[in-house]
Amino acid sequence: MAKVGIVMGSDSDMPIMSKAADILEKLGIDYEMKIISAHREPDVFFEYAKTAEEKGFKVIIAGAGMAAHLPGMCAAIFPMPAIGIPMHTTSLGGRDSLYSIVQMPSGIPVATVAINGGANAGLLAAKILATSDAELLAKLKAYSQELKEQVEVKDARLQEVGYKNY
């Protein structure tokens, strides 16, 4: 099966990036998770991005905060889809990260999820892979059905007890 790269600039991003890994694990998708700073160790980062294709990666999920160059640089070097996760920051609430990731120059696209959107990044990676994997597509459909059923259970409870006792 295809593999997904998960890369973050700092271990402080781990709580969010782990949500992407959790989704991939639930769906049976192999991944490799790394902490690499594009600013503090650019040589290590370039090697990672240049060798990702030969390692079997089909998608890279990159999370970053503040200047948030990691996702864009992955997209510039890695020839397949890059998904950016903007991290919440204390100074601007993650808007700085979001704008850095989403405002890419023409020809270097980064699929960008919500601020701290680790789970959706994992799901987007799975959906990309599922375009050529029928078994994975079936797992995604089952996952969507689980989400639907969770909402139905919550609504049934609301109807039974009312909003004041919910």
Stretches found by the model and what they are:
Residues 13-17, 41-45, 64-73, 92-95, ...:
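Short glycine/serine/threonine-rich phosphate/pyrophosphate-binding segments
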Residues 31, 43, 66, 158-166:
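Acidic, glycine/proline-rich low-complexity segments that act as flexible tails and inter-domain linkers
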Residues 48-86:
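Glycine-rich phosphate-binding loop
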Residues 2-40:
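Glycine-rich phosphate/diphosphate-binding loop of Rossmann-like nucleotide-binding domains
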Residues 8-15, 19, 95-166:
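C-terminal binding/interaction regions
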Residues 33-54:
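N-terminal beta-loop-helix "entrance" segment that forms/cooperates
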Residues 77-102, 106:
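Glycine/small-residue-rich loop that forms an oxyanion/phosphate-binding "nest" at active or ligand-binding sites
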